[in-house]
């Protein structure tokens, strides 16, 4: 293992910055140390890695299988089109990809709307604005621990449906042929029903499983369910349970999707932001859900 490896907690209930390591040349002992730190902190930040796409994919695969989005192991999350131009920045002119980018500025966990939710993600920055565009992470383990007894008892009794179609509909996104968005998650006919409390399969810690895709709690009417879930997210995603990362080109982060929520922050949409995302596949036996 690299003897210069340093892990520095962020000061929030989650997250640590890792230095003294290059992910492209990480040996098995080094990865074992990082994996243990990942389970402890749930978010690891690696400044200045400057990984190629192939190097990012190789690193991501050390965690297990990759959830293939649009048929690939890595996908651009960007307001820059394939021809190099920046997507329309005016809300009236947003294409579906911009609507997904803006939708992801609400707190969420990845792929909860799929039959098997993701276990995590490797995310890197290629082009970032000087101001804005941070990614924020919220610790749902600590949020669960801080619940009052009545709310804790209630969330243990409840589940919610998760749907990208539902969450994106709030931005007027209706997937159609020729869309700028690849359609991942928008063509799912069966809706996963997930308990509001998820027990981490490796650490055993319970956490809240909520976010923008969650809705329609059985046993509550639509308005009551929405009020309850929105209030729970607003309460949960507060200091000291939140860390915001200001990106620099070359940074890499790895987060545990099984116990964190995340969201992007706005930036001047006239400026380019190019990020690369490799989603770590969950296991059906622990991240699967009943479909309704």
Curated annotation (Swiss-Prot):
Binding locations of 2-oxoglutarate: 135, 247, 273
Residue numbers binding Fe cation: 108, 110, 262
Pathway(s) it belongs to: Xenobiotic degradation; 2-(2,4-dichlorophenoxy)propanoate degradation
Means of activity regulation: Inhibited by divalent cations, most significantly by copper and nickel, and by diethylpyrocarbonate (DEPC).
Reactions it catalyzes: (S)-2-(4-chloro-2-methylphenoxy)propanoate + 2-oxoglutarate + O2 = 2-methyl-4-chlorophenol + pyruvate + succinate + CO2; (S)-(2,4-dichlorophenoxy)propanoate + 2-oxoglutarate + O2 = 2,4-dichlorophenol + pyruvate + succinate + CO2
Single annotated GO MF: L-ascorbic acid binding
EC number(s) per entry: 1.14.11.43
Coiled coil: none
Pfam families: TauD
Catalytic temperature dependence: Optimum temperature is 25 degrees Celsius.
The protein's required cofactors: Fe cation; L-ascorbate
SUPFAM superfamilies linked to this entry: Clavaminate synthase-like
pH dependence: Optimum pH is about 6.
Enzyme class: oxidoreductase
Keyword terms, alphabetized: Dioxygenase, Iron, Metal-binding, Oxidoreductase, Plasmid, Vitamin C
Induction or repression: Repressed during growth on high concentrations of 2,4-dichlorophenoxypropionic acid (2,4-DCPP).
Cited InterPro entries: TauD-like_sf (IPR042098), TauD/TfdA-like (IPR003819), TfdA_dioxygenase (IPR051178)
Family, as annotated: Belongs to the TfdA dioxygenase family.
PANTHER family: (3R)-3-[(CARBOXYMETHYL)AMINO]FATTY ACID OXYGENASE_DECARBOXYLASE, DIOXYGENASE RV0097-RELATED
Summary of the function given for this chain in its UniProt record: Involved in the degradation of the phenoxypropionate herbicides. It can also accept (RS)-2-(4-chlorophenoxy)propionate, (RS)-2-(m-chlorophenoxy)propionate and phenoxyacetate derivatives such as 2,4-dichlorophenoxyacetate (2,4-D), however it can only accept 2-oxoglutarate as oxygen acceptor.
Subunit structure: Monomer.
Designated name of the protein: (S)-phenoxypropionate/alpha-ketoglutarate-dioxygenase
Protein encoded by which gene: sdpA
């Amino acid at each position: 293992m690299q003897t210069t490896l340093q892990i520095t907690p962020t000061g929030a209930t989650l997250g640590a910055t890792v230095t003294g390591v290059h992910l492209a040349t990480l040996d098995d002992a080094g990865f074992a140390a990082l994996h243990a730190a990942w389970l402890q902190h749930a978010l690891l930040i690696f400044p200045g890695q400057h990984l190629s796409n192939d190097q990012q994919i190789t690193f991501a695969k050390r965690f297990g299988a990759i959830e293939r989005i649009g048929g690939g192991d890595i996908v651009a999350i960007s307001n820059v089109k394939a021809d190099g131009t920046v997507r329309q920045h005016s809300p009236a002119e947003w294409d579906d990809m911009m609507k997904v980018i803006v939708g992801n500025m609400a707190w969420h966990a990845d792929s909860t709307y799929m039959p098997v939710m993701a276990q995590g993600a490797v995310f890197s920055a290629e082009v970032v604005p000087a101001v804005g565009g941070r990614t924020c992470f919220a610790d749902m383990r600590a949020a669960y621990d801080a619940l009052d007894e009545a709310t804790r008892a209630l969330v243990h009794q409840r589940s919610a449906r998760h749907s990208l179609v539902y969450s994106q509909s709030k931005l007027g996104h209706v997937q159609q042929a020729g869309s700028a968005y690849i359609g991942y998650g928008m063509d799912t006919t069966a809706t996963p029903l997930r308990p509001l409390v998820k027990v981490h399969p490796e650490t055993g810690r319970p956490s809240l499983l909520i976010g923008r895709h969650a809705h329609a709690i059985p046993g509550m009417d639509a308005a009551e369910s929405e009020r309850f879930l929105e209030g729970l997210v607003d309460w949960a995603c507060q200091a000291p349970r939140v860390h915001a990362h200001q990106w620099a080109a070359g940074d890499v982060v790895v987060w545990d999707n099984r116990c964190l929520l995340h969201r992007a922050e706005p930036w001047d949409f006239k400026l380019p932001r190019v990020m690369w995302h490799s989603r770590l596949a969950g296991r059906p036996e622990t991240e699967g859900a009943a479909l309704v």
